[in-house]
């Protein structure tokens, strides 16, 4: 490294080799140190990284390096979520086995991750399609099966025609497949389920433990679990021996029922309506479309059964309908319809001319009318009186229902974890003995244009258990199973005695910091929490939740374009194949495909992904500007929780900044020990040392407390520019310059580790190593006299101003304010729901 010019390519290669050689980031249990487990969501090996990956993994690496500098024992592992349908689809297209394609991609992506300088413990790398990983998943499946937490039954499931497989409810988004966008149909087939619903109450209760999770994720999980308290009411079917059971959360509206409605899968249909030709035609046409039409565009349809249900209170005959908006898999699959209280009921009754009455007063919408003995009662009193009446008459019971359903975990695919189950000649289900694990996939046989399931592998299907001829289960596990427990296996992936090493899990878990997109809030993060609770119940982990703190980073978005294929499907085009026309303000007005010169469609700025063909290869950026410039740009361009608009031109500014630092360090190194001129005043020294302490304080706070990395970088750049300007005006002592620039290098190190590694050695010699340095501490004495005027607000209204020391924390500030007599009066017997604090400026108590 003799050349004094900034050459990122040369520097980064050298530094990365050093890290590997010295095993800098390998971790082990060290009880003398405080641990910090930082985990980015593991990638699917799709072929190449794009900037969305780079953002996720850079955030994780910056946090990991920062906490190492705080003296903690940091674990930051990486692995590969390597089962999945894309591998099978590629296998068909390219006549290659899914395994070969997957491992080829892993090799490519691993090289890319290493080129970005991420401080992973590669000794703990996991590949989920490796039998050495999934054997433990198979063993846990058997344990769950024996505890009756896993079961198989014939059930109505979501079916994707394109992918030829079942989907869990969480994987159906607005009636279409979450992966390929195909419209979902329903099928009744035998499937494996895991009892996630049994844990619904624990899910909700333990959300309060997730104090450092985004509120949006907490809210999404609450809604997905969907706890509803209400009444389960028995209603007699007119001239039949049977009852219709309905569930309602609004018993006060019962006097306004104008019709009852059941789902297209309700058991009453088979009991009474099998021979009704009109109904059978209706069901044949609509039964397998679930309520996707309603979900997507609020299209309502139904049919009158010409059966009647007796109203449980006034004994009137109420018509019974079958409708697409009644969910077959929620509560009883039957509802009481009150058009004056429910918009969907109202629209349905208007569509089919079903008469209804109003039960709420025009003058006071909270008072009941047309409700017999319950007239003039308000909603609360009516609810209590009607509920008590129905319960006392033994017509109803208090009931709780959950929206969340048991997790369907079986898939009709080849490339997945084989389910460790066999079936004997008497149709008995038998678990594969532990000594026979792992059950390994058969060697892949290429079949043109055909997605495969294990049922095609006849030789593999037939086996023997304890000398008995048996047939293997042909379904594989949902790939979300692998990604639901990998974090625990990371703690010691080479452990051979059990699913998880108890010593390693006790030391490292729970995860201190988890990083991934908000799109995982109700799929991966639900399963992730669920699996941890299972592991907790089996004694494998000690904490009730898997993760203390969650960051949901925003997407990296970019201008994206497509055209339509002959079959009507979209073909997404790479930006390199497009000519773009912009107006004077830079707005895109049209785009043309270079090869055909035909107009194409601009889709706007959307998430970078392989499926949209809009990814920017980080390798090209690294070649041109270096990994440090890319890392710094990714962390500076936008706050981490919002979308980052990609623009390759903006990275140039970060590259120039690093070049300036590089050159300035060499200027300082060459500087002689000069006599101090009169112009170098003591008060000037105090100014820049004070400013440096201010910057250390701000940068530390922005990284540690706020995860505001962009503002932390802005503060570092601001101080560096100030230092350069000062250097040009004043003759500052060399030791003071070195102190200042060394502090800047330390603070930049988590963001740009390669350049900082080299500059540290240039300043302090070959034997020095920045990895052994600690995070700079600010000197409190510079702030003890400094006070800020803090505006105190309650519900956004100013109540007082207090002078408070700049150095103290938010918690200490709140303690001081709550002792203020003026504020005490306003907060007396009030509950503070939320506290909003803008450092050194405003604090707002929301009541």
From Swiss-Prot:
Keywords: Aminoacyl-tRNA synthetase, ATP-binding, Cytoplasm, Ligase, Nucleotide-binding, Protein biosynthesis. Pfam families: Anticodon_1 (PF08264), tRNA-synt_1 (PF00133), tRNA-synt_1_2 (PF13603), tRNA-synt_1g (PF09334). It catalyses: tRNA(Leu) + L-leucine + ATP = L-leucyl-tRNA(Leu) + AMP + diphosphate. One of its GO terms (cellular component) is cytosol. Its EC number is 6.1.1.4. It comes from the Bacteria. A motif ('KMSKS' region) lies at residues 607-611. InterPro entries: aa-tRNA-synth_I_CS, aa-tRNA-synth_Ia, Leu-tRNA-ligase, Leu_tRNA-synth_edit, M/V/L/I-tRNA-synth_anticd-bd, Methionyl/Leucyl_tRNA_Synth, Rossmann-like_a/b/a_fold, tRNAsynth_Ia_anticodon-bd. One of its GO terms (molecular function) is ATP binding. Its main location: cytoplasm. It is found in: Cytoplasm. ATP binds at residue 610. The keyword Ligase applies. Belongs to the class-I aminoacyl-tRNA synthetase family. This is Leucine--tRNA ligase. It comes from Buchnera aphidicola subsp. Cinara cedri (strain Cc). The gene is leuS.
């Amino acid at each position: 490294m003799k050349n004094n010019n900034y050459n990122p390519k040369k520097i980064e290669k050298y530094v990365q080799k050093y890290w590997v050689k010295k095993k800098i980031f390998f971790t082990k249990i060290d009880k003398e140190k405080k641990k910090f487990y930082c985990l980015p969501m593991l990638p699917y090996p799709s072929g190449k990284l794009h900037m969305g990956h780079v953002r996720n993994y850079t955030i994780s690496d910056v946090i990991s390096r920062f906490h190492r500098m705080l003296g903690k024992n940091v674990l930051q592992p990486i692995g590969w979520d390597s089962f999945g349908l894309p591998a099978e689809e590629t296998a068909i297209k390219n006549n290659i086995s899914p395994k070969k394609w997957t491992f080829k991609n892993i090799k490519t992506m691993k090289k890319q991750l290493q080129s970005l300088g991420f401080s992973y413990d590669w000794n703990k790398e996991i590949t989920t399609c490796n039998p050495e990983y999934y054997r433990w998943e198979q063993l846990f499946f058997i344990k769950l099966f024996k505890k009756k937490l896993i079961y198989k039954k014939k059930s109505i499931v979501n079916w994707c025609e394109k992918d030829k497989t079942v989907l869990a409810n969480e994987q159906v988004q607005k009636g279409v497949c979450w992966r390929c966008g195909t419209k979902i149909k329903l099928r009744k087939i035998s499937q494996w389920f895991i009892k996630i619903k049994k844990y619904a109450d624990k899910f909700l209760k333990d959300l309060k433990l997730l104090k450092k999770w985004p509120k949006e994720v907490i809210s999404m999980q609450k809604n997905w679990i969907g706890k509803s308290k209400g009444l389960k009411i028995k209603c007699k079917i007119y001239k039949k021996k049977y009852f219709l059971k309905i569930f309602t959360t609004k018993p006060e509206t019962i006097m306004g029922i104008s019709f009852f409605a059941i789902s297209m899968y309700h058991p009453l249909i088979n009991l009474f309506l099998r021979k009704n030709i009109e109904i059978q035609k209706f069901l044949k046409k609509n039964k397998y479309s679930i309520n996707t039409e309603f979900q997507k565009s609020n299209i309502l349809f139904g049919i009158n059964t010409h059966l009647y249900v007796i109203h449980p209170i006034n004994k009137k005959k109420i018509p019974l309908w079958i409708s697409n908006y009644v969910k077959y898999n929620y509560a009883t699959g039957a509802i009481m319809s009150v058009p004056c209280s429910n918009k969907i009921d109202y629209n349905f009754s208007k569509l089919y001319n079903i008469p209804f009455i109003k039960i709420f007063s025009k003058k006071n919408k909270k008072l009941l009318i047309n409700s017999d003995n319950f007239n003039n009662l308000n909603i609360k009193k009516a609810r209590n009186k009607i509920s008590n009446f129905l319960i006392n008459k033994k017509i109803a019971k208090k009931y709780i229902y959950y929206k969340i359903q048991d997790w369907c975990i079986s898939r009709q695919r080849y490339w997945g974890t084989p389910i460790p189950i066999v079936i004997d000649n008497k149709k008995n289900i038998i678990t594969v003995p532990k000594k026979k694990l792992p059950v390994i996939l058969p060697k892949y046989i290429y079949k043109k244009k055909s997605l495969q399931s294990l049922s095609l592998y006849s030789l593999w299907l037939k086996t023997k258990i304890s000398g008995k001829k048996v047939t293997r289960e042909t379904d594989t596990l949902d790939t979300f199973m692998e990604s639901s427990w990998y974090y625990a296996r990371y703690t010691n992936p080479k452990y051979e005695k059990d699913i998880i090493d108890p010593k390693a899990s006790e030391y490292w878990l729970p995860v201190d910091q988890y990083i991934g997109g908000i799109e995982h809030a109700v799929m991966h993060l639900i399963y992730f929490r669920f699996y941890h609770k299972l592991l907790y119940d089996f004694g494998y982990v000690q904490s009730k939740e898997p993760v203390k703190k969650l960051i949901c980073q925003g997407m990296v978005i970019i201008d994206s374009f497509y055209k339509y294929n002959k079959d009507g499907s979209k073909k997404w085009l790479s930006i390199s194949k497009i000519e773009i026309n912009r107006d004077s303000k830079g707005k895109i007005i049209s785009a043309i495909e270079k090869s055909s010169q035909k107009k194409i469609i601009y889709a706007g700025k959307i998430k970078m992904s392989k499926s949209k063909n809009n990814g920017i290869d980080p390798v090209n950026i690294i070649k041109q500007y270096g990994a440090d410039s890319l890392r710094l740009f990714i962390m500076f361009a936008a706050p981490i929780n919002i979308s980052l608009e990609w623009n390759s031109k903006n990275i140039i500014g970060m590259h120039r900044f690093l070049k300036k630092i590089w050159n300035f360090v060499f200027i300082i190194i060459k500087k002689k020990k000069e006599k101090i001129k009169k112009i170098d005043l003591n008060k000037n020294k105090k100014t820049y040392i004070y400013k440096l302490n201010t910057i250390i304080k701000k940068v530390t706070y922005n990284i540690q407390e706020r995860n505001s990395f962009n503002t932390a970088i802005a503060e570092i750049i601001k101080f560096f520019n100030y230092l350069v300007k000062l250097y040009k005006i004043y003759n500052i002592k060399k030791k003071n310059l070195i102190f200042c620039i060394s502090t800047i290098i330390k603070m930049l190190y988590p963001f740009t580790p390669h350049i900082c590694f080299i500059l540290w050695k240039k300043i302090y010699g070959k034997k020095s190593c920045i990895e052994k340095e600690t995070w700079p501490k600010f000197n409190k004495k510079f702030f003890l006299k400094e006070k800020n005027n803090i505006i105190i607000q309650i519900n956004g209204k100013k109540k007082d101003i207090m002078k408070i020391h700049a150095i103290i924390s938010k918690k200490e500030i709140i303690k001081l304010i709550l002792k203020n007599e003026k504020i005490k009066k306003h907060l007396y017997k009030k509950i503070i729901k939320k506290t909003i604090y803008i450092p050194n400026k405003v604090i707002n108590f929301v009541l």
